[in-house]
C-alpha cells in the first residue's frame, strides 16, 4: 500500500458516527476496512455502521472524545496512517502525533458477526417520534422505553414499568397481529437521530437500518 492510500479525511457522516459511538464506549478498536463497530463496557449495547472511508489499518483509540476534540482544532485535516505507532494529523503547517493505544485495554466487539434469528416484529421509527419520546422521558423522568404490541397496533411508550401510576408518553408506530412487550432502559438508547426500521426478536430488540 503506497503513502497516498494510507492518508484519508473523515467525512461529517463518519465523525457523527464516531461521536455517537463515544457515548457507548469512549474507547474504540477500528478494524481495517469500512465498518465501524463498538460495544459498551457492560457489553449490553452493540453498534455498527458502514462508512464511506476505508481505514488502511487497525486503529486502537483509548479516549475517543479526546481524539475527536483534537480533530476539531483543525478545519479539514488529513490523517496519515503510515507511521507504525501513531496517526499523523496534518493541515497546512500544523502537525499532530496521536499515538495508538494497546488494543488489549479496549473493550471491543467480538470478531464473529452476530447471526440474528428470524424477525418477529418490524416497525418504522421516524426521527420526530424518537426525539419526542426521548424528550418526554427527560421531562417526566421516565427510565423505560417499551415497544408494546396490542389491539392491532405497535406503540412505543416511555414509562416507569415498575410503577403502575407513573406518567406515560406513547406514540403508535405501526400495526401488528401479535401481542408483545419489549423493554429498554432509556439510558441505553444510543442512536444517531434519523429514521430507522426497528426489528424485534424473541430475545432481543434493536434498530437495524439507519436512513440518512
Q: Each predicted region: which residue ranges?
A:
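C-terminal interaction segments
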Residues: 85-109, 211
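Single conserved hydrophobic/aromatic residue that forms the stacking wall/gate
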Residues: 203-212
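DNA replication sliding-clamp ring fold and its partner-interaction surfaces
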Residues: 1-46, 50-89, 110-159, 167-201
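Extended substrate/cofactor- or partner-recognition/assembly subdomains adjacent to catalytic sites
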Residues: 163
Amino acid at each position: 500500500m503506497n503513502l497516498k492510500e494510507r492518508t484519508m479525511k473523515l467525512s461529517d457522516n463518519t465523525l457523527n458516527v464516531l461521536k455517537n459511538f463515544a457515548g457507548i464506549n469512549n474507547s474504540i478498536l477500528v478494524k481495517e476496512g469500512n465498518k465501524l463497530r463498538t460495544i459498551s463496557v457492560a457489553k449490553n449495547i452493540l453498534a455498527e455502521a458502514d462508512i464511506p472511508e476505508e481505514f488502511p489499518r487497525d486503529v486502537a483509540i483509548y479516549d475517543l472524545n479526546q481524539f475527536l476534540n483534537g480533530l476539531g482544532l483543525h478545519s479539514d485535516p488529513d490523517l496519515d496512517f503510515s507511521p507504525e505507532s501513531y496517526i499523523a494529523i496534518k493541515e497546512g503547517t500544523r502537525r499532530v502525533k496521536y499515538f495508538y493505544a494497546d488494543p488489549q485495554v479496549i473493550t471491543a466487539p467480538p470478531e464473529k458477526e452476530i447471526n440474528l434469528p428470524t424477525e418477529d416484529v418490524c416497525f418504522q421509527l421516524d426521527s420526530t417520534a424518537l426525539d419526542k419520546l426521548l424528550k418526554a422521558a427527560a421531562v417526566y423522568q421516565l427510565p423505560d422505553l417499551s415497544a408494546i404490541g396490542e389491539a392491532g397496533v405497535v406503540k412505543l411508550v416511555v414509562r416507569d414499568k415498575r410503577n403502575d401510576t407513573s406518567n406515560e408518553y406513547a406514540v403508535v408506530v405501526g400495526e401488528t397481529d401479535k401481542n408483545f412487550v419489549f423493554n429498554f432502559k432509556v439510558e441505553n438508547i444510543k442512536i444517531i437521530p434519523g429514521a430507522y426500521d426497528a426489528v424485534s426478536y424473541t430475545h432481543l430488540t434493536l434498530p437495524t437500518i439507519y436512513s440518512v
